């Protein structure tokens, strides 16, 4: 909620394209309706998220061809954003503040300076009886220029591991072997839609299925009103496996037609794919067990290091609020925006 609030304000202030579309989460069975009722109780109670019930009759009267036999839960404040425009705006503010964006510059080694408090990593233990945490004297990073192969060294007071799909690799450069981790990669295939009808004006999500590993193949919109469907969940070994798997389109069509029966399957085409970094393997997610939320924390035994692991959807919506939390962890307070 905090992320959504900040994002709407930021986009309005900095001219980033966005639109409040609203969202329906649709139920076709009584079991799905009961699942949405649990979500509604959580939203209306503990979370304070505005939602309302939309009956099947209201769904049909909207005239957009959406099917919701057991009704829909509406989130009226959900919206869409120009993700690239958002990144460009943030980059501009970062550079205006003196920051440098160094693309194609992989980090190859990280050494915490000072301390010897048992965190592991690349420096010798202190002889002090009460050693300070590793990183208490800063950090040293080796960075390779992908174009020339040359390696340079950067020192910093703090580091924030926000490397996304590469965040586990960065984490593992610092910690001892017994504290290493890995990410599990869920590719999401998206499919574009070229037909003029049906034309839907809001986001449509199927009711969540326990252990599905994602939110289902939903209907999303771009700022021009064009519809896309996705993402599905395809477990892959490499975070670079971004080829759209057209063989999965038949399964996607079957899922889409449950809530949009009038969709013309011949007008769907493979569009693009993205990778979600999961903290739990496919088997754990598939059984509904072993779920892990985002990791945003200072690591025990280290100073000046904030770790961000498993930041997938809704990481974009949460991004500005995550920034606030990182600032609070490092400095104890948040600078007013």
Residue map of PLM features:
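Short loop/edge segments at beta-strand edges and connector loops
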Residues: 20, 55-56, 103-105, 111, ...
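Dinucleotide-binding Rossmann-like beta1-alpha1 core, especially the glycine-rich loop
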Residues: 1-58, 62, 69, 217
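Short aromatic/hydrophobic contact patches that present stacked aromatics
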Residues: 23-25, 72-74, 190
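C-terminal lid/capping helical subdomain adjacent to the catalytic/cofactor pocket in oxidative enzymes
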Residues: 123-126, 288-337
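Active-site substrate-recognition segment that forms the wall
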Residues: 16-18, 152-301
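A general structural signal for well-ordered alpha-helical segments in protein cores
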Residues: 4-7, 33-39, 56, 87, ...
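A short, glycine/Asx- and small/polar-enriched loop/turn
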Residues: 31-35, 62-70, 111-116, 123-124, ...
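Helical element adjacent to the flavin cofactor pocket in flavoenzyme catalytic cores
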Residues: 73-115, 122-124, 133-157, 320
């Amino acid at each position: 909620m905090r992320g959504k609030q900040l994002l709407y304000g930021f986009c309005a202030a900095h001219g980033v394209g966005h639109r409040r579309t609203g969202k329906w989460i649709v139920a076709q069975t009584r079991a799905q309706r009961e699942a949405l009722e649990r979500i509604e109780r959580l939203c209306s109670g503990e979370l304070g998220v505005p939602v309302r019930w939309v009956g099947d009759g209201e769904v049909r009267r909207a005239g957009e061809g959406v099917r919701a036999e057991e009704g829909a839960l509406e989130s009226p404040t959900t919206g869409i954003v120009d993700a690239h425009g958002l990144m460009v705006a943030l980059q501009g503010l970062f550079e205006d503040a003196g920051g440098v964006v160094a693309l194609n510059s992989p980090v190859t080694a990280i050494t915490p300076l000072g301390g010897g408090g048992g965190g592991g990593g690349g420096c010798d233990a202190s002889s002090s009886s009460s050693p300070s945490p590793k990183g208490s004297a800063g950090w040293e990073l080796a960075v390779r220029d992908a174009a020339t192969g040359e390696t340079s060294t950067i020192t910093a007071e703090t580091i924030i591991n926000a490397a996304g799909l590469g965040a586990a690799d960065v984490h593992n450069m610092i910690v001892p072997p017994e504290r290493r981790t890995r990410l599990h990669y869920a590719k999401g295939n998206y499919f574009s839609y070229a037909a003029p009808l049906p034309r839907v004006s809001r986001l449509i999500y199927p009711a969540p299925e326990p252990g599905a590993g994602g939110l289902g193949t939903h209907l999303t919109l771009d700022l021009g009103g064009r519809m896309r469907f996705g993402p599905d969940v395809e477990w892959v070994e490499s975070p670079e496996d971004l080829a759209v798997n057209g063989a999965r389109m038949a399964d996607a069509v079957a899922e889409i037609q449950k809530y949009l029966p009038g969709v013309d399957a011949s007008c769907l085409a493979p569009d693009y794919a993205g990778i979600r970094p999961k903290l739990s393997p496919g088997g754990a997610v598939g059984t509904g067990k072993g779920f892990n939320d985002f990791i945003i924390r200072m690591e025990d035994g280290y100073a000046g290091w904030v770790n961000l692991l498993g930041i997938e959807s809704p990481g974009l919506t949460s991004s500005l609020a995550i920034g606030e939390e990182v600032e609070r962890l490092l400095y104890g307070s948040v600078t007013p925006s």
